[in-house]
């Protein structure tokens, strides 16, 4: 009986061992198969990346990839500007505004590249002058520099009239007011100056009388005078460029060529015919009212007025306006805003 019991126990032990070995061998074989499959996939990927003759599989391009990679987008997915500009359905849509803005920006860039690619002979411009309401208009040239090339471009042709200019062009009233708002966010009115240029003296005098009806105005009116017009030599142009950029060591000869003025005959000065009007004010309220007056004149006479705005290096404040300046800025910088609201 004892021998039979020992035999049975030995058999059971062998069966358990065999079952364990079968399980471990199965797991080992499965792991080996998985590793071999992974290695084959990795080798195939490496071969596909290294081989130059492999062609990528063409997949349909969705709108997300078209937005990120526009060079891989088909023609029907791309932004169709003509569709949004001409279709009546998009008359009041933002897509119409976006397409118009993109088209206008491309047009301005093309116009500027055409303008800058050609050399400039002078900075003179022709403009009809209204000496009175009954006399005829005359053409006045600003300088005596003659054109050397027929393909040269007039520098002031880039500035269009207020009626035909786009809303974001350099001479538009919208751009002029946006620059005033931008400067007023950083500086006060004592550092900002409005400049008006025109050949029509009657128009400048009318604008001066209109501005004098606004309080706290400081106006400087005069006609521009130019000295004798001469051309610079290439050595002078290179010297002044090197002087400012610091590409070469600043020697005495370089400073002399850069700083020494070109002597001309002072008796050859002459009046250009352009009247300039400089406007300053101690407060933002006064200067903003003056800007609206200038814009109204520019809209009524678009071809005869040029507006400009400048930021001064130091405040221009008269003694009569110091108390006005202090009382106006007291509520902004010193006291609490709650006092104004109450």
Curated annotation (Swiss-Prot):
Pfam families: Herpes_IE2_3. One of its GO terms (biological process) is regulation of DNA-templated transcription. Residues 14-25 have a biased composition (Basic residues). InterPro entries: Herpes_IE2_3. Residues 1-33 are annotated as: Disordered. Signal peptide: none annotated. It comes from the Viruses. Belongs to the herpesviridae U84 family. This is Protein U84.
């Amino acid at each position: 009986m004892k021998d039979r019991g020992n035999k049975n126990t030995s058999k059971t032990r062998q069966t358990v061992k065999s079952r364990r070995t079968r399980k471990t061998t199965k797991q080992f074989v499965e792991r080996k198969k998985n590793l071999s499959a992974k290695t084959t996939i990795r080798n195939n990927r490496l071969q596909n990346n290294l081989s130059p003759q492999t062609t990528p599989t063409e997949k349909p391009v969705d709108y997300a990839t078209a937005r990120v990679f526009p060079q891989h987008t088909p023609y029907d997915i791309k932004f169709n500007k003509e569709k949004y500009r001409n279709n009546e359905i998009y008359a009041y849509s933002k897509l119409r505004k976006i397409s118009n803005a993109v088209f206008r920006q491309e047009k301005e860039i093309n116009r500027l590249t055409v303008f800058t690619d050609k050399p400039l002979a002078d900075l003179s411009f022709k403009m009809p002058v209204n000496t009175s309401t009954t006399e005829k208009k005359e053409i006045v040239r600003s300088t005596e520099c003659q054109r050397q090339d027929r393909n040269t471009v007039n520098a002031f042709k880039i500035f269009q009239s207020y009626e035909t200019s786009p809303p974001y062009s350099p001479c538009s009233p919208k751009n002029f007011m946006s620059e005033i708002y931008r400067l007023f966010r950083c500086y006060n009115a004592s550092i900002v100056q409005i400049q008006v240029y025109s050949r029509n003296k009657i128009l400048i005098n009318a604008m001066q009388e209109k501005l004098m009806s606004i309080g706290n105005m400081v106006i400087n009116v005069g006609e521009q005078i130019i000295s004798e017009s001469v051309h610079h030599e290439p050595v002078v142009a290179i010297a002044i460029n090197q002087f400012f950029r610091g590409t070469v060591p600043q020697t005495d000869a370089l400073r002399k060529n850069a700083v020494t003025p070109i002597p001309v005959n002072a008796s050859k000065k002459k009046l250009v015919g352009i009247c300039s009007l400089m406007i300053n004010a101690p407060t933002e309220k006064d200067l903003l009212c003056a800007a609206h007056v200038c814009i109204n004149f520019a809209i009524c006479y678009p071809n005869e007025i040029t507006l400009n705005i400048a930021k001064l290096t130091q405040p221009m404040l008269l003694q009569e306006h110091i108390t006005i300046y202090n009382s106006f800025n007291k509520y902004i910088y010193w006291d609490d805003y709650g006092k104004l609201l109450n």
